Design a protein with these regions (language model features):
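Nucleotidyltransferase catalytic core that binds NTPs
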Residues: 1-186, 197, 216
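Phosphate/ribose-recognition catalytic cores of enzymes acting on nucleotide-derived substrates
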Residues: 2, 183-223
Length: 223
């Protein structure tokens, strides 16, 4: 997320970062409970990067209505891939994004392309609701072995982290999504999906109990 902040700083006079682990985006309580939290470390990193403002709100402030008012997008886009395996996730995501937009009132809003389906839904919501905010998608930041950076990576053991590097490698090299599924399963990954859409190869897998997602830009898919 620091790369999103850096991009925002380059393109704007003021940058606002927000940290909020949104319970409404988790369809499993266990996943919410175990989601990595490092507030003090995050604050120190944002201070070092000289972010102008950090917005920290609790659930009672974000949801004074106890989550009774929600944003539902009803097309196929919000029913497939991530939505199929994480019911309610995109409802919670769109709802909290809209709330923060009304609080901050930004000129631009920045999102990572690793969550590509999420990015498309956000763009669609902004257009449908006439939100005068520019949506900026930012390239995925990766470790030296190609694994997309994610807070969930911290939950991987050393052995699992080594194995996880095969995830993006296979997505990049496999001739088809079906071949990618077979190769990932042969290495012991539990595969939720691999799909070629929007010029990208989108995928979600488990390494042990840790769920990883990716959305690689594949040039031959864009032609």
């Amino acid at each position: 997320h620091l790369s999103l902040c850096a991009r925002a700083q380059q393109e704007n006079e003021l940058t606002v970062a927000a940290i909020f682990v949104n319970a409404s985006q988790f369809n499993q309580t266990e996943d919410f409970v175990h989601y990595p939290r490092s507030l003090e470390e995050d604050q120190a990193l944002l201070e070092k990067q000289k972010i102008d403002y950090l917005l920290l709100l609790d659930a009672e402030t974000v949801y004074p209505d106890n989550y009774q008012v929600q944003i539902h997008e009803t097309s196929k886009l919000s029913k497939e891939l991530e939505a199929k395996f994480r019911p309610g996730h995109f409802i919670g995501m769109l709802t909290v994004v809209l709330k923060y937009l009304h609080i901050v009132k930004p000129t631009r809003s920045y999102y990572g392309e690793k969550d590509y389906q999420q990015l498309l839904l956000i763009k669609k919501m902004f257009q449908a609701l006439f939100l005068e905010v520019e949506v900026v998608g930012c390239p995925t930041v990766r470790a030296s072995d190609g694994l997309a950076l994610s807070s969930r990576n911290s939950r991987l053991t050393a052995q699992q982290r080594e194995k996880a590097a095969y995830f993006p490698a296979i997505l990049n090299q496999a001739a088809t999504s079906e071949v990618a599924v077979q190769q990932l399963e042969n290495l012991g990954f539990k595969v939720d999906y691999v799909a070629d859409q929007w010029g990208r190869r989108l995928a979600a897998v488990y390494v042990g109990e840790v769920r990883l997602i990716d959305a690689l830009l594949i040039p031959q898919l864009a032609t």
